[in-house]
């Protein structure tokens, strides 16, 4: 005969967040001793977290608070849309914004519910039963920041997040720029930000390709510059054709709106 009641199981589940069968087994092992059962579940949870640490967490969500954006990972999209997981991510994002977190280490160290975020994460991992990970954080400088969050599916949390720092009064134009970054994945704001070694490499590739195609020697300089310009259109936000007005560049659209883009940050779940 069991030396515990259904009420004991319910209470233990409420306190620990463990599953019903785990609670029953813990109470049986503890011979009905409630505190001992809690200890058993805590030890089991710690062991399970250790096992989960070897698994991959490639799903998750992007959360934003103020000028700060974070990525929190889980193993499955089922957990990624779990309300408790989402609430935890929002709390961490708010704490990260207050701390202006700019790295994984700074993200793990922010305080949530009286403890470090990384410790709170481990507890949630034990409760949910999946490996969870605080992946990264970034904070963008600026008095005005436009935010765009993209959902891959209506029932899932945001998988792509973009922050765009800007000057000007047209928030809609800045938001459109953020949507552009989300969709076309610009790497740089302008061609001035592209590293010199990257530009040199692109020139080499353009020249080698043109020679392989048998282009005339005297035409090479113009061909190289044209292909370099095409590269900038691919990777530089201001040089890209606008998704809202395809005959204009993003810079032209922003200039007409009286908006100056100062910088941007883009996160996508599972991407570096």
Curated annotation (Swiss-Prot):
Intracellular or extracellular location(s): Cytoplasm
One Pfam family of this chain: EF_TS
Classification via PROSITE patterns: EF_TS_1, EF_TS_2
GO molecular function: translation elongation factor activity
Alphabetical UniProt keywords: Cytoplasm, Elongation factor, Protein biosynthesis
Region Involved in Mg(2+) ion dislocation from EF-Tu, annotated ranges: 76-79
GO CC aspect terms: cytoplasm
Family: Belongs to the EF-Ts family.
Function recorded in the entry: Associates with the EF-Tu.GDP complex and induces the exchange of GDP to GTP. It remains bound to the aminoacyl-tRNA.EF-Tu.GTP complex up to the GTP hydrolysis stage on the ribosome.
Protein name, as recorded: Elongation factor Ts
Protein's gene: tsf
